[in-house]
């Protein structure tokens, strides 16, 4: 059989994860192990929970990350080696030398642009020469770039979204209409919804007249005490994950962020995104 090396492209919410899990079931049914790699623990955990919900109960799956308890890590490492675990969901922890698979046949890498070629090879080597690889990305890649950078892989594109997806409504407001926007935000919070508020800069700049996330955070905290969080590139990855987890668990209603905001993570209660200086 020929080895699969495929990129699956599709917009956020188009169903890439479901497609990958269906293909994983086929591989498991053929007595091979599967590894799904995600860049953050929060995303790996969401994929793991979805699989637990969808997979038959007799399929053994595990979640492995750098934050896993040592006793759990030892158990998972042993079960992968002994072919007791059929699919593992994890972060960079899966790259470790001590992670040895009994019969790895399929690797799924979500948000593939977050991982380097060497990292992908490290994981692929754990499955031998015939290990299939599926990369997933929500980032549209121009055809010419695809041919030059990804010329050695097949490409599949999900062009349609599930029929139940509601239409996204987009509105444009002048800066002078901020009171209208705030009234709308207040109404959404009252209804139990959450809001992403995206700014192009972290801090105020004398050279560029754009909104900064820090200033917007200070402004919104006064209006919505204890309901606003802040996320930007100067925050370390561990703290960033804590903030995203708090937002996911509805500990606050508005997340002010720069464009580093994660794609792929499912925030079921966040149905509004406000983008300052959208032209940037």
Where are the language model's segments positioned?
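Inter-lobe coupling/hinge segments of SF2-like helicase ATPases
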Residues: 1-280
């Amino acid at each position: 059989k020929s080895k699969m090396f495929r990129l699956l492209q599709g917009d956020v919410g188009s169903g890439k994860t479901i497609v990958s899990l269906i293909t994983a079931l086929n591989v498991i049914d053929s007595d091979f192990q599967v590894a799904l790699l995600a860049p953050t623990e929060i995303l790996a955990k969401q994929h793991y929970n979805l699989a637990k919900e969808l997979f038959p109960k007799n399929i053994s799956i595990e979640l492995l990350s750098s934050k896993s308890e040592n006793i759990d890590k030892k158990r998972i490492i042993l079960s992968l080696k002994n072919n007791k675990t059929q699919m593992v969901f994890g972060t960079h922890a899966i790259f470790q030398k001590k992670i040895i698979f009994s019969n790895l046949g399929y690797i799924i890498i979500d948000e593939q642009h977050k991982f380097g070629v060497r990292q992908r090879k490290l994981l692929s080597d754990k499955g031998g020469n015939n290990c299939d690889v599926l990369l997933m990305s929500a980032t549209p890649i121009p055809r010419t770039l695809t041919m030059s950078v990804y010329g050695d892989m097949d490409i599949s594109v999900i062009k349609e979204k599930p029929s139940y997806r509601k239409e996204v409504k987009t509105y444009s407001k002048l800066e002078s209409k901020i009171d209208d926007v705030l009234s709308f935000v207040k109404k959404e919070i009252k209804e139990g919804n959450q809001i992403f508020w995206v700014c192009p800069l972290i801090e105020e700049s004398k050279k560029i007249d754009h909104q900064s996330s820090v200033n917007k955070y200070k402004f919104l905290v006064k209006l919505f005490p204890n309901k606003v969080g802040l996320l930007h590139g100067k925050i370390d990855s561990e703290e960033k994950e804590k903030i995203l987890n708090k937002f996911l668990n509805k500990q606050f209603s508005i997340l002010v962020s720069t464009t580093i905001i994660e794609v792929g993570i499912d925030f079921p209660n966040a149905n509004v995104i406000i983008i300052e200086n959208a032209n940037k």
